[in-house]
Amino acid sequence: MKDPRDIPNETKWRLAAGYAARLPVLYDAAFRPVAGEKYDEIEQEIWMDLSRTAFAIARDLTLAVGTAQDLAETMQVVMVILFGPGFRIEALNVSADRSVILVKRCPFLEQEGASFGAGSPVFRRCMAFTLTSVPLLNKKYSARFVRTMCTGDRQCEIKIAEAEDLTATTKKKK
């Protein structure tokens, strides 16, 4: 029998993260028929609660959260820790108070197997986690999704800026 300590940590992490990424799909298949429309609300609460873990990781690893770029880099680290090395993420510095997270590969989307459009369960999960995590890490900032792979875009783009700046930008576009 092989001793688990002989398996490289990177391999164990990759395998565990792959199975963890599959869990939302399995839960959806098992519980949606029972919970019906209530399932989305319950699942959103779970992903919002998971953002507390993002805060705990940032605190425990003393990750920087003071600027938009700090937040983007911290979210990059947290998402890879929580969701595995299958995530391919970049944190781009746009200006002193703005940053963009680019997601180029998403293990959750890979588990879903296809593009689902605006009603994608992957998008709802990611949105609940990300939009809750950023202000928990620094209440002056918020996040806004600009592009998403689960709605057919080539990559996800998530803007991070001071909360009032994102609100003003959104109102101008309406």
Which stretches of residues belong to each language-model region?
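N-terminal accessory segment detector
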Residues: M1-S99, P107-R124, P135-L136, K140-K174
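ATP phosphate-binding glycine-rich loop and adjacent ATP-lid/helix-beta elements
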Residues: R125-T130
